[in-house]
A protein has these predicted regions:
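Short flanking/linker segments adjacent to small metal-binding domains or redox-active Cys/His motifs
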Residues: 80-117
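Short, solvent-exposed positions on alpha-helices
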Residues: 9-12, 61
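Histidine-centered nuclease catalytic patch
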Residues: 12-48
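Short Cys/His-centered divalent metal-binding micro-motifs
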Residues: 16-19, 47-75
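Short, charged surface segments at domain edges that flank catalytic/cofactor-binding sites
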Residues: 1-10, 89-93
Length: 117
């Protein structure tokens, strides 16, 4: 969903255009706070944005550049809220299925809107 949501935006880190034409896609859903160090933020949309693979994987996430891009996109207050969020979240299997279904629904809607443009 995040990759589709941000498809028309530049990379959150470097500002270069995203290119979906490459095999396997040329961009990922990158997380500002990694899912390894902050698994509780995995499904928080402010924490996830389209990011070129070069920035996400081989640039070690480019945290400083990501933060600067994030401030431009969502504002300093929301970035600081992400940075301060230490609230653990434990999802049940049913909650995870509901999240999956919600994101599938939203992705279908995005694709339909893009097809109608």
């Amino acid at each position: 969903f995040i990759r589709a949501r941000d498809a028309d935006k530049p990379c959150i880190c470097c500002g270069l255009p995203l290119s979906a034409g490459d095999v396997g896609g040329a961009y990922d859903c990158g997380h500002y706070r990694s899912t390894g160090s902050a698994p509780h933020l995995r499904f928080v949309e402010d924490n996830a944005h389209a990011q070129r693979k070069q920035c996400n994987r081989w640039g070690a996430g480019r945290a400083v550049d990501y933060r600067l891009g994030l401030i431009q996109r969502i504002g300093l207050e929301r970035v600081e809220a992400l940075e301060a969020d230490q609230e653990p979240r434990k999802y049940t299997a049913d909650e995870l299925k509901a999240l999956r279904d919600e994101y599938r629904r939203r992705l279908r809607k995005l694709r339909q809107e893009a097809a109608n443009v």
